[in-house]
């Protein structure tokens, strides 16, 4: 995983389901943002709560009525993040989830992320130092644990 370990024998096996935000949003372009999130759920009983989450992230009802292909890059990223947060999964993988978002959307996304991942393993790959500091999670830098339990304050730009 990310070059942290080089297996020499055995096998790698995941436990449970994994939710992810990739650098490409991988949304269904013909569906609305809400419909894209509902795809990961067994039914639509959570639609009102999903709409509230979108409101917290700054997407209004007009944006939610558009097909995903007409959303801005930042709106697509917020949709992908919400879909991963709502997806049933034991582990969350986030690859540059805040790319293309304005600062207010990043802060709102970080606040929601912190609330929703309590006790859930998260692997976040980002170059966004402000986001790392705001999250305050343990961090790996240059393949070493930089500071357990809190974000690192070093100025080294070689994050992996």
Please tell me what each predicted stretch does.
Residues 2:
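Helix-to-loop junction immediately C-terminal to a conserved catalytic motif
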Residues 67, 96-97:
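Walker B catalytic motif
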Residues 67-71, 75:
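Conserved ABC ATPase signature
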Residues 81:
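Hydrophobic anchor residue at the start of the ABC signature
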Residues 87-88, 118:
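Conserved signature/switch motifs of ABC ATPase nucleotide-binding domains
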Residues 95, 102:
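ABC-family nucleotide-binding domains
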Residues 24, 30-45, 49:
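Q-loop/switch helix immediately C-terminal to the Walker
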Residues 47-63:
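Conserved ABC ATPase "signature" region
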């Amino acid at each position: 995983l990310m070059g942290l370990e080089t297996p020499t024998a055995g096998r790698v096996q995941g436990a449970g389901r994994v939710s992810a935000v990739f650098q490409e949003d991988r949304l269904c372009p013909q569906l609305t943002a809400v419909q894209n999130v509902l795809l990961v759920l067994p039914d639509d009983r959570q639609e009102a709560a999903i709409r509230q989450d979108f409101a917290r992230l700054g997407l209004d009802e007009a944006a939610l009525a558009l097909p995903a292909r007409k959303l801005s890059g930042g709106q697509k990223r917020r949709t992908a993040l919400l879909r991963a947060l709502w997806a049933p999964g034991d582990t969350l993988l986030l690859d540059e989830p805040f790319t293309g978002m304005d600062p207010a959307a990043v802060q709102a996304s970080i606040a929601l992320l912190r609330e929703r991942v309590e006790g859930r393993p998260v692997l976040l790959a980002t170059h966004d130092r402000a986001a790392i500091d705001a999250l305050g999670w343990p961090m790996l830098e240059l393949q070493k644990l930089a500071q357990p339990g809190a974000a690192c304050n070093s100025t080294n730009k070689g994050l992996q």
